Design a protein with these regions (language model features):
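Conserved helicase motor core of P-loop NTPases
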Residues: 1, 89-119, 124, 157-167, ...
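ASCE P-loop NTPase helicase motor core
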Residues: 2-77, 81-84, 99-228
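Catalytic phosphate/metal-binding cores of nucleic-acid and nucleotide-processing enzymes, i.e., regions
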Residues: 4, 70, 92, 135-139, ...
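C-terminal accessory regions
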Residues: 15, 320-419
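Short, conserved phosphate/pyrophosphate- and ester-handling motifs at nucleotide-, phospho-/glycolipid
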Residues: 36, 254, 379
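Short beta-alpha junctions and helix-cap segments that line functional grooves
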Residues: 43, 158, 297-299, 397-402
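Conserved acidic residues
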Residues: 144, 248, 383
Length: 419
């Protein structure tokens, strides 16, 4: 396992082709991946811009996990079959004999190792929502290396799961960003193998990178116009958050602020008083879909139609959406996340506790996407971002929070800073 770390503007992405060439690797040899669908999409766009036309990264989940729960008894059977196959290969009893015995033995040993790890998890966890996939394309496509982007978002367990495939991992990440939610960093907790520290001259001239670097060093910028569409303004100057023509992504720190902003923006858009998503409204996936692989946690989608108001007492409703590629889909959706905006209360649902629990487990989790928290924004990037600075809420992680929020902007940035 090799960790390549670097702050914004140090060239983590631009150095990747040189690493591939130095190792003599082609795109076909590499499993490119990232923690979220949006991060994987951004990684792919950067790779293809560098000439790697066939580079289409996947999420870590789709790369190494199976979408359905495997119960302990199923895993036990699979493990027994894998061990029997290994013994047949080892003793020469396999029929027909393999063309490459050494390679077949190695592949079978990998499968046994993965199944043993997954079975151990099944025995010790009450709610196993996914399992490692012993038939991952890492094995079936004979990948030589895993290249993981946005490694700061990966926790200890996922890092261990990646390592269990016994394929070299190159993890690339920014230690200035927030650690994974509810977990310790899996790759960036210690000293990286290589640390890019020098900011490229072109990047150093970018006001977004300048502000990000200041924040990372514990400094804060003054109110004013920094050029290139980058500003720091007072809350009373904020006429931008409600300017729907700007097509900016709003990032804040708390659900309370997110609910307030969403209410104001929906009212400005003409949707005030309407409880359900209306045609064209931005939405965001809040957990991975079990049906549509492309709809992973953090994916931006849009409402495809005007939906009737949410029915009080119901746990679910049918949501028509369009994904990032414009494809239409109909989703059974947990409506509690939308009802939270009405009550301004986390985990609130008008349905019975039993019905709400069942819908949260089985249905899609979607929320309004006008304003999102910084944690939800990790791994994504937008041309224009408006940051409502609530970094003070995060105490010791205040600098990491604001640094992460700032670096979500690719071209234009407005920071609404407290007085």
């Amino acid at each position: 396992m090799f960790v390549l770390a670097g702050f914004a503007g140090t060239g983590k992405s631009t150095i990747l082709p040189d690493i591939m060439n130095e190792l003599g690797l082609t795109v076909a040899d590499i499993a490119f991946c990232a923690p979220t669908g949006k991060a994987a999409k951004v990684m792919g766009e950067k790779l293809r811009a560098q000439g790697f036309t066939n580079a289409y990264p996947s999420t870590v989940h789709s790369l190494i996990y199976q979408p359905k729960m495997q119960k302990a008894e199923v895993l036990e059977k699979q493990l027994e079959e894998a061990k029997t196959q290994w013994m047949a290969l080892k003793t020469g009893a396999a029929d027909p004999p393999p063309a490459n015995l050494r390679m077949e033995l190695k592949e079978q040993e990998r499968k046994i190792h993965i199944l043993e790890k997954d079975l151990d998890r099944a025995y010790t966890m009450d709610d196993l929502r996914f399992s490692l996939n012993p038939d991952s394309k890492l094995i079936t496509d004979d990948k030589k290396i895993i290249i993981l982007d946005e490694a700061s978002m990966v926790g200890v367990e996922m890092a261990e799961d990646l390592a269990s495939f016994e394929i070299p991992v190159l993890a690339i990440g920014d230690p200035g960003q927030l650690p994974p939610v509810g977990d310790e960093p899996g790759f960036l907790s210690g000293t990286p193998d290589f640390f890019l520290t020098e900011i490229h001259r072109q990047a150093a001239e970018n006001p977004i990178i300048r502000l990000a670097t200041m924040v990372r060093k514990g400094e804060r910028g003054d109110y004013g116009d920094y050029g290139g569409g980058v500003m720091i303004i007072r809350p009373k100057q904020d006429e931008f958050s409600l300017d729907l023509a700007r097509d900016a992504q709003i990032i804040c720190g708390t659900n309370k602020r997110r609910w307030q902003l969403t209410s104001k923006i929906r009212k400005a858009a003409g949707f005030g008083g309407l409880t359900a998503p209306q045609a064209g409204e931005p939405l965001i996936m809040c957990k991975n879909s079990k049906i549509h692989p492309a709809l992973v946690n953090g994916t931006s989608i849009f409402s495809a139609s005007d939906h009737d108001d949410l029915e009080e007492g119901s746990a679910r409703f049918i949501l028509d959406i369009k994904d990032e590629e414009g494809a239409a889909k109909r989703l059974f959706t947990y409506q509690g996340l939308f009802e939270e905006h009405l009550k301004r209360e986390k985990n609130w649902s008008s349905a019975s506790k039993q019905a709400a629990f069942k819908s949260r487990i089985t249905d899609h989790s979607v929320d309004f996407g006008w304003a999102i928290t910084c944690h939800k924004s990790q791994g994504s990037q937008w041309d224009e971002v408006i940051v409502h600075d609530e970094s003070w809420v995060f105490k010791e992680a205040a600098d990491q929070w604001l640094y992460t929020a700032i670096t979500r902007a690719a071209e234009r940035l407005i920071i609404v800073a407290p007085e």
